[in-house]
């Protein structure tokens, strides 16, 4: 089985902000970026296509020719809870951030998720997908989802996750027996 995972294009959010599951706008360069993704997918056919229900993924899937991609909550970005749309600089003064920065794999953000939570939901989806009998599938998702999928595939350990966040519009292919 081949699973193609595509990160959405760049977002119109200042650098250094936790935007996670917030439905943010895409940059004005969307069409230019999306065209590159679409070209990279030309010639490929998929048994099924999914996407995160967040607009930044739905829009890219639609642009690439998959307006009916199945919306899947398990491929949403990490939920930063109360920290959504706050700058990392501001969060450093939040007393709860010390514990999270010390163990972001296991500690949840306030009213949000830990990386382990996200990994578990992405893994659940990938397990189900692999059991489906399909050969080639595509998922339009987020940097954190692609990172969790690579951990799932054994490319690196979860502790290396934030060192390996894919670029906007990046496509990764994971192959399983």
Indicate where each model-derived feature is located:
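Glycine-rich phosphate-binding loop signature in dinucleotide/nucleotide-binding domains
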Residues: 42-45, 129-135
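Short beta-strand scaffold positions
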Residues: 51-52, 120, 140-141
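Short, hydrophobic/glycine-enriched beta-strand segments
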Residues: 2-8, 139-140
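Phosphate-handling substructures
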Residues: 64-121
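Active-site signature of alpha/beta-hydrolase-fold catalytic machinery across serine-
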Residues: 63, 148-152
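Active-site-proximal alpha-helix that buttresses catalytic centers in soluble enzyme cores
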Residues: 6-67
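A glycine-rich beta-strand to alpha-helix segment
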Residues: 135-146
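Domain-level recognition of soluble alpha/beta enzyme cores
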Residues: 156-177
């Amino acid at each position: 089985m081949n699973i193609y995972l595509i990160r959405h294009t760049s977002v119109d959010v200042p650098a250094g902000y936790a935007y996670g599951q917030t439905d943010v706008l895409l940059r004005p360069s969307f069409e230019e970026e999306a065209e590159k993704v679409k070209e990279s997918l030309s010639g490929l056919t998929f048994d099924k296509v999914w996407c995160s229900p967040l607009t930044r993924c739905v829009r890219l899937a639609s642009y690439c020719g998959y307006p009916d991609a199945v919306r899947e909550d398990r491929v949403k970005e990490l939920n930063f809870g109360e920290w959504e749309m706050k700058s990392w600089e501001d969060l450093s003064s939040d007393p709860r951030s010390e514990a999270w920065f010390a163990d972001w794999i296991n500690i949840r953000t306030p009213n949000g998720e830990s990386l382990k939570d996200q990994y578990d939901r992405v893994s659940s989806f990938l397990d189900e997908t692999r059991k489906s009998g399909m050969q080639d599938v595509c998922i339009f998702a987020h940097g954190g989802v692609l990172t969790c999928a690579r951990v799932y595939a054994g490319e690196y350990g979860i502790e290396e996750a934030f060192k390996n966040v894919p670029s906007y519009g990046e496509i990764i292919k994971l192959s399983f027996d």
